[in-house]
């Protein structure tokens, strides 16, 4: 069970007479607005003499030209927005072949042109397969990434190109379809950090020509889908009470299935930042979740899951202790089943409060 978004007993600490607006809203971002402009608009739409909506942020930037799913976290939900920053994302894009722009999309200036070779579905399928899976991608100059404290697009606007280290990305699904003799449609599911503008340019090059994006729409972020969104104009047309019905719970961004139920006394203690011994409360499901997460943690640090099993089986007391002390984030709920935050729990039963919502 999740905490409701705008309960009257949740007063803002900055404005004690106001209700803190907390939750996640899925907005269909319109073309032409920056992601931050959409956030500012949403903050305004949830503001009232009785409601405080000053704290808000999105879970991953969309370019001004792009449309589609933009999850926005308000209030206490901002504590958990990073879970969606790391989530896989799906996009649908239109690539115009035959020309390249300085920004990689239709907002830029054409810098080069090339003839477009004939192509069919078989060729598009072959090209798509070349890009499936793990690879490295060099970020574009027109991006908000920083070098020496300065954003790359600031260098680009000054006509300066700087070296950018390639980044590891994974394309988990990709499909190319012909629209006409000059345009193709790209549908892709990719890992965080993927620039679809760069992908579009690379696809065009693989086809023997140049290309740039003329349309980009985000369809999915983690488990959030485009058909769950509300258009910004539609949200604005609603009275405040109806806008609030579109708020998802504060924990909507969290992709963690394991949960630990705490007594009222334990809830009070974790709210004060105290560690707890919960070894007797770790169910088989929770222990299994922690063990699996530890395996994944070790694998991410260049150890295989088999290696982690060997560590558990070893007679080396220090290594055995190390594995059992690795903290894993799980949900914390109270006796009524209401979400109260996240805690880091290890197999030795140690619970460290991590991110708690303010009741």
Swiss-Prot record:
EC number of the protein: 5.4.99.25
Keyword Ribonucleoprotein applies: no
Domain of life: Bacteria
GO molecular function: RNA binding; tRNA pseudouridine(55) synthase activity
Enzyme active site: 63
Pfam families listed in its UniProt record: TruB-C_2, TruB_C_2, TruB_N
Known function: Responsible for synthesis of pseudouridine from uracil-55 in the psi GC loop of transfer RNAs.
Family: Belongs to the pseudouridine synthase TruB family. Type 1 subfamily.
Protein name: tRNA pseudouridine synthase B
Taxonomic lineage from the root: Bacteria, Pseudomonadati, Pseudomonadota, Gammaproteobacteria, Moraxellales
Gene from which the chain derives: truB
